[in-house]
């Protein structure tokens, strides 16, 4: 049975690679890469190449409205472009997609054991004879099939295939998110928080994951004393802040002391300066309102993005894994420049919570 499951995984990986290759080397490649559903000013590969080109000829990529990712990622793209041919670069994106699917699958296998323990503790507080409770619990025999389903969804869903074909840099973002979850689930505190600070450096909206990651780490340590729990969370916050400050310092060194990237990467995104149409609502709203009200509504919309994490954390603190899932849903809905690559992050994790599909209003 195990060998059959592995054979299916190999088959879906092969099929996913073939789908991506058939589209990448077809006449539809350029059309897909230009679609606003797939590429945004913050993840389009054409902008990454332009940024690297400007850097190589001695022009600051952050002077104009060209490149809007952090200097660390800019130099990573430069490294890839310099050592690989164009067709070889594409297979780096394909490999990143495969790794993301496998890592998310591993995360679900590991987390399911903890979720079973959480459910068992919660059952002690309720009537264990209630037959409705058993219907909403994870069945241990379903964890392997759920993990396999995640691989199928991620590798075969158009929301993952199209960004890979377009070589959207969000492919690397999704891989980092998966690695953060894996490191936190395996209780690698320093690694998970460093990776979170790295991804926050590039897209600060993913700082929303900080509460759930801290709670996952605290949950894994199983501190029963409230004082030790508090100190564990504070220590995690300290590691994250120090890592983020260090990465910002390294970025400044890469830019030879210039702070122009702060305006291009963070202020540009916060003020929603590019009103290119996308699948979000920010661009439409801010293209219609009077400039007199623009600053007010920018703050309202941005606060609206972050405010939900407070009640969600308070309500779901006992189940940080579900909190992380809901956080990804919130992130994909309310961020200013969403693409389909944001949607696949939580869609591929739906099988993990398939035991809740029976819930009815």
For the regions a language model picked out, list residue spans one by one:
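Hydrophobic alpha-helical membrane segments of integral membrane proteins
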Residues: 172-176, 192-195, 208, 345
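Transmembrane-embedded, aromatic-rich helix segments that form part
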Residues: 192-196, 205-219
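Alpha-helical transmembrane segments of secretory-pathway, organelle, and plasma-membrane proteins
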Residues: 347-349, 361
